[in-house]
Each structure stands twice: as structure tokens, then as C-alpha cells.
């Protein structure tokens, strides 16, 4: 279970492991990046519609913007955005079979576990590295628990920001 499903004090302990990345000071420090990302997406949107053809604002702006932000916080490479977006859509769109939705969830968990191993080997300034180095390496969490937290932030970060 992740901290969403826990009561205090376990909820507070697990939430505390990642909350510094979501505090105002950290978000304020990302503001220039967020504004630039929004501007880049808007510029790309304008370029797509320069000949008067319609452009899907949701697909080309509203969905990618929060994804880029949460992926930056987590440490997810942007090159993986299409795969992650597709898997998340399958698991949440309501028209997939239960088997397909479950497979998509497992695909995301497997992806996060692989990324977690990479961050253990080469940490960066991101949530996954922080969990790996500060929680799993010293034995406060096992890898599966840390992967679940990262998975929760990945899927909830996309869903709640949009």
C-alpha cells in the first residue's frame, strides 16, 4: 500500500519522504522551467496550427504540461512520455478490458522499477533518487514500497494536475 491508503503515523512518514519536492520553495524554484515549458508547448501548438488547421489543445498542451512537470520532479526521461501516456490512458480510460488495464499498470510498475535501479546506480536530484538513496539503500523501505510510491506520484500527478 502507498501513503494514500494509510493512516497516521505511517501516512505521514511515507508522505514526508517525498514532500520536499512539492513544497512551495521547491515549486517556486521550478517556476522558470514551468513557464518555459508552457511557452515551448504553446509555440509548438501555434506552429502546428499556422496554416489554419485545427489543433487539439488537450493533446498538445493540457496533457503534456503537467506530465513534463511531474516527470521532472520524479526524474522520468521525457523520451518516455509517449509510452507512459499510453500505458496510463489504457489503465484509466474505462474502455480497456480489465486484463489490459492490469497489464498497463504492471507495465508502469515495471518501468518504475527499472528507472529506480538506474537511479540507485546514478542518483540525480529527483524523487526517485531520493527514495533510492535515503530510504531503500539504508533499509527504511524495500524497493517494492518505493516503486509503489513513485508509481502513485506518476499516475496521481498526471491525473490531479490535469
Which ranges hold each PLM region?
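Alpha-solenoid HEAT/Armadillo repeat architecture
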Residues: 4, 23, 27, 117, ...
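Active-site substrate-recognition loop segments, prototypically the cytochrome P450 B′-helix/B-C loop
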Residues: 1-58, 67-85, 89-95, 99-103
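Central I-helix of cytochrome P450 enzymes
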Residues: 60-63, 67, 71-72, 135-162
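Cytochrome P450 catalytic core segment centered on helix I
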Residues: 41, 84-139, 144
Amino acid at each position: 500500500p502507498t501513503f494514500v491508503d494509510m493512516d497516521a503515523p505511517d501516512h505521514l512518514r511515507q508522505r514526508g519522504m517525498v514532500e520536499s519536492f512539492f513544497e512551495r520553495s521547491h515549486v517556486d524554484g521550478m517556476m522558470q522551467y514551468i513557464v518555459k515549458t508552457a511557452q515551448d508547448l504553446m509555440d509548438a501548438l501555434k506552429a502546428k496550427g499556422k496554416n489554419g488547421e485545427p489543433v487539439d489543445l488537450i493533446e498538445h498542451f493540457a496533457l503534456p504540461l503537467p506530465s513534463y512537470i511531474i516527470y521532472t520532479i520524479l526524474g522520468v526521461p521525457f523520451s518516455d512520455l509517449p509510452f507512459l501516456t499510453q500505458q496510463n490512458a489504457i489503465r484509466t480510460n474505462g474502455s480497456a478490458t480489465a486484463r489490459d488495464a492490469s497489464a498497463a499498470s504492471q507495465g508502469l510498475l515495471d518501468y518504475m522499477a527499472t528507472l529506480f535501479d538506474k537511479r540507485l546506480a546514478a542518483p540525480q536530484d529527483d524523487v526517485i533518487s531520493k527514495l533510492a538513496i535515503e530510504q531503500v539503500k539504508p533499509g527504511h523501505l524495500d524497493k517494492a514500497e518505493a516503486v509503489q510510491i513513485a508509481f502513485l506520484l506518476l499516475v496521481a500527478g498526471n491525473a490531479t494536475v490535469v
